[in-house]
């Protein structure tokens, strides 16, 4: 009887329902990361020295940081402006659906669209020719970086707008009405009433945008291949090339460095957000 009660209490425990998920995390995340960590130290610090002294690694890190530094602020700014523009408008539901369409388009189709649009004889150069501007070889010059940023913003703008709108919908109308009664302008309402209320949403969007910025490799790879124009040679290209050449030790060391960088960025943003929230 006691044994039955013991097993019955275990079965009814809420923690039991976490076991399948925790088992999945352990098998497909913790164990592979542990194996990768061991692999990275297979030659002591030799692999880390080789990675940190690799010129291709320096170029990939520089381009990735540049992409993140340009793409995320532009995405946040444009999506917030668009969310403000359509919030509570009669077209809001329709526009929300339109903005989400790029997320439903498969990557292969997106790549085909960009190839047609930015081809030497494509739509972009025809538009430039209409204004008597010379054609640009988009994917073989530094203009490829702009194409990649545009692709990233176009793909991620929709869900970011939806998140901003969801945050705005949670702000009580009474706060905005009280501010307007006190004579606050639209700009002052946005700056002093809306933005402070959207800090949690800002943190969520920034983290999601940061993570999604590392998924743009698919477009860059399918458009320009494993060795693209140097301005869009990202960390993912480097990892892919090392994997192709079976340089697993280097790849493991670089992955550990990247994981540490991700963790530091996430913790820094979280601490900054919590500190501002306290004050």
Predicted regions and their residues:
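N-terminal hydrophobic targeting signals that begin at the initiator methionine
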Residues: 1-4
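A structural signal for multi-pass alpha-helical bundles of membrane permease subunits
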Residues: 6-279
């Amino acid at each position: 009887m006691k044994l039955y009660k013991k097993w019955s209490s275990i079965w009814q425990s809420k923690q039991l329902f976490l076991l399948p998920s925790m088992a999945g995390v352990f098998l497909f995340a913790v164990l592979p990361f542990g194996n990768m960590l061991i692999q990275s130290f297979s030659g002591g610090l030799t692999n880390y020295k080789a990675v940190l002294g690799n010129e291709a690694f320096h170029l990939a890190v520089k381009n990735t940081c540049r992409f993140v530094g340009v793409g995320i602020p532009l995405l946040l700014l444009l999506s917030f402006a668009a969310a403000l523009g359509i919030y509570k408008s009669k077209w809001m539901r329709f526009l929300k659906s339109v903005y989400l369409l790029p997320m439903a388009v498969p990557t292969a189709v997106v790549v085909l669209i960009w190839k047609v649009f930015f081809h030497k004889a494509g739509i972009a150069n025809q538009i430039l020719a209409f204004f008597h501007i010379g054609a640009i070889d988009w994917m073989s010059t530094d203009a490829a970086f702009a194409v990649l940023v545009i692709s990233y913003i176009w793909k991620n703008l929709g869900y970011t707008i939806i998140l901003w709108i969801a945050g705005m919908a949670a702000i009580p109308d009474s706060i905005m009405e009280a501010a307007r009664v006190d004579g606050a302008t639209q700009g002052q309402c946005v700056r002093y009433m809306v933005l402070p209320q959207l800090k949690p949403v800002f943190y969520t969007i920034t983290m999601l945008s940061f993570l999604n910025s590392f998924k743009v490799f698919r477009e860059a790879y399918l458009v320009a291949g494993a060795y693209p124009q140097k301005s869009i040679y990202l960390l993912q290209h480097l990892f892919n090339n090392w994997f192709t050449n079976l340089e697993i030790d280097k790849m493991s060391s670089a992955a550990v460095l990247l994981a540490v960088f991700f963790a530091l960025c996430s913790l820094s943003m979280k601490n900054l957000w919590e500190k501002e929230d306290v004050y």
